Amino acid sequence: MPTRFSKHRKSRGDVCAGYGRVGKHRKHPGGRGNAGGLTHHRINFDKYHPGYFGKLGMRHFHLLRNQYHCPTVSLEKIWTLVPESVRKSLAAKNDGTAPVVDVTQKGFFKVLGHGILPTQPIIVKARYFSKVAEKKIKAVGGACILVA
């Protein structure tokens, strides 16, 4: 073994200082990986990984998650999702430009048709639209875009 690769050049007597001759440096004295986490490596695990071992609480075996989770937003609340600065600038221009509102980014999936929309057009992106909501948005010159 070239000495320039060893951790210390001077091997002092040279019997297995290069760790050769069948396992003289021994293999894995502390065990591999997370071995000994409850015994000889316990201090490390308790300090840096508290709660790694053991159980806590009870599992809910037959938990049924809501498969039809679909948070909704009404048309009357749609303009509150547009930033106020954008609202004012659009009202001042009045040239027909429409803001794009992605309700999925705000945590809603479906747009419902309750309420009255201003006459200003608006582009709404959502996963679902009710028929009334779609009709009202298109009536003011807006657009409904379906998002996956």
UniProtKB/Swiss-Prot annotation:
It comes from the Eukaryota. The gene is rpl27a. This is Large ribosomal subunit protein uL15. Keywords: Ribonucleoprotein, Ribosomal protein. GO terms for biological process: translation. One of its GO terms (molecular function) is structural constituent of ribosome. GO terms for cellular component: cytosolic large ribosomal subunit; extracellular matrix; ribosome. Residues 18-38 are annotated as: Disordered.
